Amino acid sequence: MKDIDTLISNNALWSKMLVEEDPGFFEKLAQAQKPRFLWIGCSDSRVPAERLTGLEPGELFVHRNVANLVIHTDLNCLSVVQYAVDVLEVEHIIICGHYGCGGVQAAVENPELGLINNWLLHIRDIWFKHSSLLGEMPQERRLDTLCELNVMEQVYNLGHSTIMQSAWKRGQKVTIHGWAYGIHDGLLRDLDVTATNRETLEQRYRHGISNLKLKHANHK
């Protein structure tokens, strides 16, 4: 119980610190939320969205799952996206993967993990789709590249959702970004697949894949 009690103690200290810095902080926070950003990231405990972006409570709407997937049958994720886009009217959606992702590695190595294997089939599909590129790489670079490809594919998936297609059609200004986080250095990397409408979604996706192929060619 001691470890659990520590969490409560930490919370009390955190709350006290914020109130000392801004006495009206929680009163203002309780009134409403109006975040400009939706973060779709991995569940990995080493990727704390608010801390690594330097944002405060109320500034970042967050959805996390294993390997930061956006799947058209995942009502959990899509409900979050629809609320963020249609109700909160966020301006930016960030899909962020990370190097050293256990989900990506498990999708490649395919160990028997139970139910999670079904979830990881979506990454295995990406692995097979880009096998001609990935198959030529050493293992570490292959996993890093698959992490980046996974982000690009999820940006593409989200952009083709009815939620985003409808938002763009009605002229709503909401941009999708694809990033990768380095646990080894704490830095975010923009994968240059930013989409602001249906046209740029296709263009930036093709551009991102081409960049990865060029990057691989330069490593040969």
From Swiss-Prot:
Q: How does this protein assemble? A: Homodimer.
The record ties this protein, via SUPFAM superfamilies, to: beta-carbonic anhydrase, cab
Which cofactor(s) does the record list? Zn(2+)
Entry GO terms, CC: cytosol
Instruction: Give one GO biological process term.
Output: protein homotetramerization
CDD domains in the record? beta_CA_cladeA
Q: Which NCBIfam families match?
A: PRK10437.1
In terms of InterPro entries, this protein maps to: Carbonic_anhydrase, Carbonic_anhydrase_CS, Carbonic_anhydrase_sf
By its UniProt entry, which Pfam families does this protein fall under?
A: Pro_CA
Which residues does the record give as Zn(2+) binding sites? 42, 44, 98, 101
* GO MF assignments: carbonate dehydratase activity; identical protein binding; zinc ion binding
Q: What is its EC number?
A: 4.2.1.1
Q: How is the cofactor bound?
A: Binds 1 zinc ion per subunit.
Organism superkingdom: Bacteria
Q: Which principal EC class is assigned to this enzyme?
A: lyase
What's the name of the protein? Carbonic anhydrase 2
- Catalysed reactions, semicolon-separated: hydrogencarbonate + H(+) = CO2 + H2O
Family per similarity comment: Belongs to the beta-class carbonic anhydrase family.
Q: Which UniProt keywords apply?
A: Lyase, Metal-binding, Zinc
